[in-house]
């Protein structure tokens, strides 16, 4: 199998990252969405397919109803998921899946039935020669060059904190909150409404997402930043809308991601903050490994891309950790693709060859083989 290039596919709630093992970055990055016309006549004479996938669905989203097959990190609609994989292989990567070993990623605590369903679809629908399913956070840790640490992985649909010791996640200490990128986009839209800008349709929320990604940052000291924003215009930035109109945003730039640190105060949600989530996960682990975890807090995923987030998380964790411990937060510049890169690295190792689930393994044991070979 060594002569067949491995396809690495990281399926996120919001974005699919796909490419080939051994490369530094994914070849294809596209929205994890399926779009169907709201009413068929709206698209007649344009290009009336019954459904659109990825970037094309994104471009036409004004006239489409958008479906996300992955919700909060977990596949909920297998028919649409199969379409996304089909699109990944044949359109984005332009490969025949039966000619390539496939590495798929999964959320921590992915239900057993889901792991089996992924395995079944890959071998039976796509006829792949070999498969491996890896936990996203473990791959992020590998991409940071470590085998022990705690990964705070915040994507579009869910945020996880996953303690990992010597390459294995510690399942009982994994924590998750349903607060991630999509929630921050909606929250920013709410904040902009207070300024008199209304963004409500799905196409308009895409604009808000772009504003969020380009202009938002995390304040090291929120109260101080808020006071400064009242006293001066230093945080104000302009943003040009697609129609050429220019809007100004100020304190919203740091009030939006503050939601991660103060979910109750900012938006009335009784959830753990990302600092409490991280601290709780570490405290759930054996006392002997805690120091190693505090010294290797790895940020991963698109929702950790805000400027200032690493410094703020460090400050918050230092306030909670034992004073004798030197806390360290690692925020690599390309952490948006950390999971994918970890998969690319892992499958390139010569020692990985024995880890694949082969077609023979599947034929002999069925889908449950995934629980034995992909721990």
Curated annotation (Swiss-Prot):
An annotated GO cellular component: cytoplasm
Entry EC no(s): 3.6.4.-
InterPro entries: Actin, Actin/actin-like_CS, Actin_CS, ATPase_NBD
MF-aspect GO terms: ATP binding; hydrolase activity
Pfam families given in the database record: Actin
Top class in the EC scheme: hydrolase
Keyword Nucleotide-binding in annotation: yes
Keywords: ATP-binding, Cytoplasm, Cytoskeleton, Hydrolase, Nucleotide-binding
Subcellular location: Cytoplasm, Cytoskeleton
Catalytic reaction(s) noted: ATP + H2O = ADP + phosphate + H(+)
Origin superkingdom: Eukaryota
Family: Belongs to the actin family.
Known role: Actins are highly conserved proteins that are involved in various types of cell motility and are ubiquitously expressed in all eukaryotic cells.
Protein name stated in the entry: Actin, cytoplasmic
Species per Swiss-Prot/TrEMBL record: Oxytricha trifallax
């Amino acid at each position: 199998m060594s002569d067949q290039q491995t396809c690495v596919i990281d399926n996120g709630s919001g974005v699919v990252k796909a490419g080939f093992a051994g490369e530094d970055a994914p070849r294809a990055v596209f929205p994890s969405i399926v779009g169907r016309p709201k009413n068929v006549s709206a698209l007649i004479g344009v290009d009336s397919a019954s459904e659109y996938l990825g970037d094309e669905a994104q471009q036409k989203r004004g006239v489409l109803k958008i479906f996300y097959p992955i919700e909060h990190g977990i596949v909920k609609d297998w028919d649409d998921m199969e379409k996304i994989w089909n699109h990944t292989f044949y359109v984005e990567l332009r490969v025949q899946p039966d000619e390539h070993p496939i590495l798929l990623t999964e959320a921590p605590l992915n239900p057993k039935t889901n792991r089996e369903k992924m395995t079944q679809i890959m071998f039976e629908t796509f006829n792949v020669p070999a498969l491996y399913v890896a936990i996203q956070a473990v791959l992020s840790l590998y991409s940071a060059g470590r085998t022990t640490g705690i990964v705070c992985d915040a994507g579009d649909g869910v945020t996880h904190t996953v303690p990992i010791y010597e390459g294995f996640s510690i399942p009982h200490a994994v924590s998750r909150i349903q607060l991630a990128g999509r929630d921050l986009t909606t929250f920013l839209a709410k904040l902009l409404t207070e300024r008199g800008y209304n963004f409500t349709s799905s196409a308009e929320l895409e604009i808000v997402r772009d504003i969020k990604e380009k202009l938002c940052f995390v304040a090291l000291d929120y109260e101080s930043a808020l006071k400064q924003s009242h006293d001066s215009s230093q945080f104000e930035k302009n943003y040009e809308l697609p129609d050429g109109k220019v809007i100004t945003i100020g304190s919203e730039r740091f009030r939006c991601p503050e939601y991660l640190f103060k979910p109750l105060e900012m938006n009335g949600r009784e959830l753990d903050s990302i600092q409490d989530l991280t601290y709780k996960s570490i405290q759930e682990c054996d006392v002997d490994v805690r120091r190693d975890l505090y010294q290797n807090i790895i940020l991963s995923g698109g929702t950790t891309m805000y400027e200032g987030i690493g410094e703020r998380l460090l400050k918050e964790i230092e306030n909670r950790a034992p004073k004798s411990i030197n806390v360290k937060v690692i925020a690599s510049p390309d952490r948006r693709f950390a999971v994918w890169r970890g998969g690319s690295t892992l499958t390139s190792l010569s020692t990985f060859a024995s880890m694949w689930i082969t077609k023979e393994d599947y034929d002999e044991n069925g889908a449950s083989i995934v629980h034995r070979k992909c721990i």
